[in-house]
């Protein structure tokens, strides 16, 4: 069988707070490469979407291509990411690793289109603990990694309930898309063990 993996390398994934040992991008790259190792050992054909290693192949050479791509900084990246259109083989699976925090009108249609091809798949949402807990109070300046979005407030704590409600809404939307298509949604924080996330991801793929 074939497994296609999309690893979000947008600027929002570069975020890392003091509460986490690694950025979202670093964690996504680690999990992507570790998954590639498992797929290689299982003699699966695997491809890395939107890269020169997108064509599914087997073996160590493909794994080395992945390692080279994931260890290099992208030449350019948008503020937020969404999976590009992909043509999935009928006997195949897909994995998307991202924070899925981009604009709703961009992210959700892209996920729906990919999931609507009749194949199994997994969404792995990777967030920093700060993005889940919103531990801010008083005067705070918020700025996206790409510096395209800025907001300053004297009452950060007052934004917490609205932010958490929006986060819950986004996760509900992801869950609905996953349920309709038979995909699975896995949540992971960058202050948690990557090993646990990898095991859950591999199990969701049926142990490949």
Predicted features, each with a name:
Residues 1-208:
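Exposed, interaction-prone extracellular/peripheral surfaces
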């Amino acid at each position: 069988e074939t497994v296609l993996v999309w690893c979000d390398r947008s600027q929002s994934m570069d975020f890392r707070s003091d509460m986490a040992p690694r950025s979202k991008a670093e964690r996504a790259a680690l999990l992507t490469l570790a998954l590639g190792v498992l797929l290689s050992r299982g003699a699966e054909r695997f491809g890395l979407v939107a890269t020169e290693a997108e064509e599914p192949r087997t073996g160590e050479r493909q794994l080395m291509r992945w390692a080279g791509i994931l260890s290099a900084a992208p030449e350019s990246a948008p503020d937020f990411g969404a999976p590009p259109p992909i043509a999935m083989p009928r006997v195949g699976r897909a994995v998307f690793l991202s924070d899925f925090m981009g604009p709703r009108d961009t992210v959700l249609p892209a996920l729906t289109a990919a999931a609507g091809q009749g194949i199994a798949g997994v969404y792995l949402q990777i967030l920093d603990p700060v993005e889940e807990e919103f531990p801010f109070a008083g005067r705070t300046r918020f700025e996206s990694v790409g510096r395209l979005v800025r907001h300053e407030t004297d009452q950060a704590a007052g934004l917490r309930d609205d932010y958490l409600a929006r986060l819950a809404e986004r996760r509900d939307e992801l869950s609905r898309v996953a349920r309709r298509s038979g995909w699975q949604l896995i949540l992971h924080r960058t202050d948690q063990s990557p090993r646990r996330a990898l095991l859950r991801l591999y199990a969701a793929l049926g142990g490949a």
